[in-house]
Amino acid sequence: MVTILDRTKPDDKRIRHPEKAHKPDTEVLRKPEWIRVKAPTSKGYQETRELVRSHKLVTVCEEAGCPNIGECWEKKHATFMIMGEICTRACAFCNVATGKPNALDREEPANVAKAVRQMGLSHVVITSVDRDDLADGGAEHFEQVIWAIREASPATTIEILTPDFLKKPGALERVVAAKPDVFNHNMETVPGNYLTVRPGARYFHSVRLLQRVKELDPTMFTKSGIMVGLGEERNEVLQLMDDLRTADVDFLTIGQYLQPTRKHHKVERFVTPEEFKSYEDIAYTKGFLMVASSPLTRSSHHAGDDFARLKANREKKLLAAAE
């Protein structure tokens, strides 16, 4: 998937990660063969690139060197990142800029909806930076974007990938009430890594958030993803699966962590394709409707196709239960 940022001002040459500037460089491991991909050159990729340029948008995929950019852009898939490009958190794995964000762009919901319509998207993913500076964590903005897309492109299915709305009472309820088709909130890693990898978040708050979505709307699909290769143990990953199933999460994604810069958390190891397949098999036995587990899996990768499969798998499960 393409992660797109709507920028209204040019870069101000600010330090992208000021909180990491003082840290020593970490070792960058050589990527194994199963991680490497060909440089994007297809006609579809070039057309998407021109489309993005014509909308005066900037892609995180380009800046971060996402390994899936060629495949996703060829298919004209898009994930829009809303509420600016500056995050109030400072996760050790993430390449999004950190600092004090700008004010919300009130035209953004309409602009995103217009782009969705013009690009002819059948399925769109909306994500955002964390906005701890806002009273509702950006819940109203998510709501407005969903409504705008529904009006501009009624046939488009909507998947949201949200922050955790930590200490924002009522925020989650507002977003769920806007009726996205899929609610995704990534756990990112196992609980033992949170203090070093995701220090601004709370593991069981995220589990509870996903559980609460199902309580508010039992028909809404829920989804979560993690990275591996951050030093986690296998038994920790299996326990995380159990925690997500306790929250009735439908869809789990597991992918390899790739280090953005030498200032970010190091890759402890590259998990083999065979291990990813093992995780997938185990996750299905635990009751997930959908599992995507591979080195290059990302939470929005193949999102449209996966949504169709997710619906079909639920229908099969309901039919089997009725027999």
Curated annotation (Swiss-Prot):
Pathway(s) annotated for this protein in UniProt: Protein modification; protein lipoylation via endogenous pathway; protein N(6)-(lipoyl)lysine from octanoyl-[acyl-carrier-protein]: step 2/2
Compositionally skewed regions (Basic and acidic residues) per UniProt: 1-14
Cellular component terms (Gene Ontology): cytoplasm
Residue numbers binding [4Fe-4S] cluster 2: C87, C91, C94
Any Pfam family hit: LIAS_N
Reaction catalyzed: [[Fe-S] cluster scaffold protein carrying a second [4Fe-4S](2+) cluster] + N(6)-octanoyl-L-lysyl-[protein] + 2 oxidized [2Fe-2S]-[ferredoxin] + 2 S-adenosyl-L-methionine + 4 H(+) = [[Fe-S] cluster scaffold protein] + N(6)-[(R)-dihydrolipoyl]-L-lysyl-[protein] + 4 Fe(3+) + 2 hydrogen sulfide + 2 5'-deoxyadenosine + 2 L-methionine + 2 reduced [2Fe-2S]-[ferredoxin]
PROSITE patterns linked to this entry: RADICAL_SAM
Keyword DNA-binding: no
Keywords: 4Fe-4S, Cytoplasm, Iron, Iron-sulfur, Metal-binding, S-adenosyl-L-methionine, Transferase
GO MF annotations, alphabetized: 4 iron, 4 sulfur cluster binding; lipoate synthase activity; metal ion binding
Binding site for [4Fe-4S] cluster 1: C61, C66, C72, S300
Domain Radical SAM core: 73-289
Stretches for region Disordered: 1-25
Compartments it resides in: Cytoplasm
Broad class of enzyme this protein falls into: transferase
EC number: 2.8.1.8
Cofactor note: Binds 2 [4Fe-4S] clusters per subunit. One cluster is coordinated with 3 cysteines and an exchangeable S-adenosyl-L-methionine.
InterPro entries assigned: Aldolase_TIM, Elp3/MiaA/NifB-like_rSAM, LIAS_N, Lipoyl_synth, rSAM
Main localization (coarse): cytoplasm
Cofactor field: [4Fe-4S] cluster
Family: Belongs to the radical SAM superfamily. Lipoyl synthase family.
HAMAP family: Lipoyl_synth
NCBIfam families to which the protein is assigned, alphabetical: lipA, PRK05481.1, PRK12928.1
Name of this chain's protein: Lipoyl synthase
Protein species of origin: Allorhizobium ampelinum (strain ATCC BAA-846 / DSM 112012 / S4)
Phylogenetic lineage: Bacteria, Pseudomonadati, Pseudomonadota, Alphaproteobacteria, Hyphomicrobiales
Name of the gene this protein is made from: lipA
